Amino acid sequence: MAVLAQSAEICYTKPERKCFPVRCDCHIHMVLDGADWKRAIARHSGGVDEVWVRRVLETYQKLGFAYLRDGGDRWSVGAKARSLAGEYSITYRTPLSPLCAQGHYGGFIGEKYENLSQYAAMVTQKRADGADFIKIMISGLMDFDRFGVLTEDGLPPETIRELIHIAHEEGFAVMAHANGARTVEAAALAGVDSVEHGAYLDTDALHAMRENGTVWVPTLSTIGNLRGTGRFDEAAVAAILESAMENVAAFAAMGGLIAPGTDAGAWAVPHGSLSEYALLKQALGENAENVLSRGAAEIQRKF
């Protein structure tokens, strides 16, 4: 499987080629390669592979990307990319590593905390270490073989509220990996700055995001790029994508903020892919450019 969009195996469709002249990706993982997460992480086991990082940054530069927001990793790969990005005329933002609750999703890539006191200390340390923002993991993943199913429930609303409050008190914007209507609603009501993924939302969750100025980064590529791969149930993948695209359209119609982010590095999502723009354009129609430009500008303002 190709891991960079400039690879010969990647052929853009006409809708992808007609997308925006100045591109940004508001959710990537420099440490991952879109094919094999264990192999990708091992690439940096002896220290950050600068050759890899430069190759990825060059790919984004050639495709016209000017802004990248990393979801973080605990091996300092995103931090290295940030230090080099200026050479490629790219603004790069990173939380350094995401923070996840012990026993819950995210430990494969992030730092674990056992309680709120430990989390607060980690947030303070992020300030000292130079993080641009805080990334929290507050839910599980979609089960791509079963529509409507998540791999685990979200954290309790009161915990979500405290996580966001602590980070805001330190002066950080907060990016939240969040799926499920109640989890996203709780995060939005607590003032989270952006929601990543956001599967299976309902009207209450969408309104909460709209009323609280939450930017939604739906990462449709993590679903749409699974089609035809044979890895998951095709009917389930199609249903999950349809649900997400319907919610994207509904959120835009109510004036919500939506920004493009591929989750590049996730399986079947190569760095530099323009698939997110194509999927969002399909969901948003002729207003796509205006909607996404507005959302992307807000991400860049907040983060």
Q: Where does each model-flagged region fall?
A:
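His/Asp/Glu-enriched, well-ordered alpha-helical/loop segment
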Residues: 241-303
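Histidine/acidic residue-rich metal-binding segments in metalloenzymes
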Residues: 117-137, 143-216, 237-258, 290
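Active-site environment of divalent metal-dependent phosphoester hydrolases
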Residues: 29-33, 74-78, 100-101, 140-144, ...
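Short, positively charged and aromatic/hydrophobic N-terminal segments
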Residues: 9-13, 18
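Acidic/histidine-rich helix-loop elements
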Residues: 33-47, 102-113, 145-153, 227-236
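Metal-associated gating/positioning segment near the N- to mid-region
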Residues: 23-84, 103-106
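Divalent metal-dependent hydrolysis catalytic cores, especially in the metallo-beta-lactamase
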Residues: 50-78, 89-99, 131-144, 173, ...
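Histidine/acidic-residue-rich catalytic or RNA/ligand-binding cores of hydrolases
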Residues: 34-39, 184-190, 223-234, 244, ...
